[in-house]
Amino acid sequence: MIFTAFILDYWYFTLLFLIAAYFIGKHVYTNYLMRKHHAEPILDVVDDGAFGFKFGFQSLKAKKIGNQIDLLFLKFNEAKHPSIGTFVTRSFGMQFIATKDPENIKAMLATQFNEYTLGQRLNFLAPLLGKGIFTLDGNGWKHSRAMLRPQFSRDQIGHVKMLEPHFQLLKKHIIKNKGTFFDIQELFFRFTVDSATEFLFGESVSSLKDESIGYDQEEIDFAGRKDFAEAFNKSQVYLSTRTLLQLLYWLVNSADFKRCNKIVHKFSDYYIKKALTATPEELEKHSSYIFLYELAKQTRDPIVLRDQSLNILLAGRDTTAGLLSFAVFELGRNPEVWSKLRQEIGHKFGLDSYSRVEDISFELLKLCEYLKAVLNETLRLYPSVPRNARFAAKNTTLPHGGGPDGMSPILVRKGQTVMYSVYALQRDEKYYGKDANEFRPERWFEPEVRKLGWAFLPFNGGPRICLGQQFALTEASYVLARLIQSFETLELSPEAAYPPAKLSHLTMCLFDGTPVRFE
């Protein structure tokens, strides 16, 4: 009775005692875990300001002006020991570890793969993408990967001839703008959604066909086709913000977000219904390869088909469009690189009126070494997924970041977020020299690049390495080769800012587009 009265009369002392006990207990338990896992305290702690809300709002502000990716890049340089490449900070109250250390990334993606998960990613992305290969963990992910892997064999990704009709439409748009500066990034996104929907569904949305190049708008036979690309884009903006807000993701669930998701789902459901109405015998007899029809041989569940198709569509459209946009941006400001590419492509496939389009194949494109170097250098400076995250499935460690020299293991508590920046890693002078921020394809012919290992990760690594990497590289190689065959010069607008602002949703592209001129 007296004890209860004391607590009620001096509740503030009780509260202070409980708070102190909590932090002391947490400190003692953390030290115990560090001893158990042979870990050291993390060397760098970056000031987050007001429980990370300062950094969180900085990120939201930077996102609006195309500087969000560079903000994290600068945080690495502002750390007390920038060469360590690992620090701890907060965002919107959540503590997380940020790293660009190749060994730490290798641990999460490969050697300690089972100790790290995607965490809340399914909750962030499910309204649009559902349960697909990019949102699932564990057995669900294993099943998805086993189901999708056969769809990306060389026979499927090597059919470059299907790209030519789409390139001809792209070329008409370029010719229409010939001699003037225009944004080709917007056209690349239309090109890749056209080619991706043909690969996935057997029928292109033909977004490049419009009145500006002499086409009447195609009559649509179901609602949502015209609005699909716009809705898909807007949904990704919402998903990106949900991801940025982490535990507060549920705040982003507006009526417009739901409307966009409904349009995208209705679009994909149209094709899924067509695939499911076909008998297994009809699916086998289909003359050309269609991703959805092959998938329908393995499952007749319409939700599974929709979710996996949209996951692949996201990767197939956005990564390739971003890669092409950044490549053309750099080629436009580096005419000597464009000239070298013309020499290689001319030697292999001819140029201008002497172009041998029929000779371009998956196998021969892989032999174009300078073209490969240009794409590698583009992916190095502008990785499609510039940053990513993993969450500790249990109390575990990362190899580097602790101790007086930053080379000792650090503790990662169960549920803790680890964000890794491929963008920062691939611009690190430690691995790429003093000119790490410069576009120089020739570096890929130097012996040092053979030693890069996990310092070059444009398509992730480990068991979750991107299934579609050859698909993206083949498509980008084909489009660049055909542009080089078709146009003699490429110039970037003198008004284009450098370095360019970057728009990062789930993947990265140019914030202000790619203003170029072809002749």
Swiss-Prot record:
The Gene Ontology CC terms held by the record are: membrane
What is its induction behaviour?
Answer: By N-alkanes.
User: Cofactors per UniProt?
Assistant: heme
Q: Which residues form a coiled coil?
A: none
Query: What Pfam families does this protein map onto?
Result: p450 (PF00067)
Q: Where in the cell is it found?
A: Membrane
Q: Quick one: which residues bind heme?
A: 466
Say yes or no: keyword Iron present. Answer: yes
Q: Which UniProt keywords apply?
A: Heme, Iron, Membrane, Metal-binding, Monooxygenase, Oxidoreductase
Q: What is its EC number?
A: 1.14.14.-
GO function term, MF aspect, one: iron ion binding
Organism superkingdom:
Eukaryota
Q: Does the keyword Iron apply?
A: yes
Q: What class of enzyme is it?
A: oxidoreductase
Return the similarity comment: Belongs to the cytochrome P450 family.
Give the function comment from the record.
Answer: Together with an NADPH cytochrome P450 the enzyme system catalyzes the terminal hydroxylation as the first step in the assimilation of alkanes and fatty acids.
Name of the protein described by the UniProt record = Cytochrome P450 52A10
Report which gene this protein is encoded by. Answer: CYP52A10
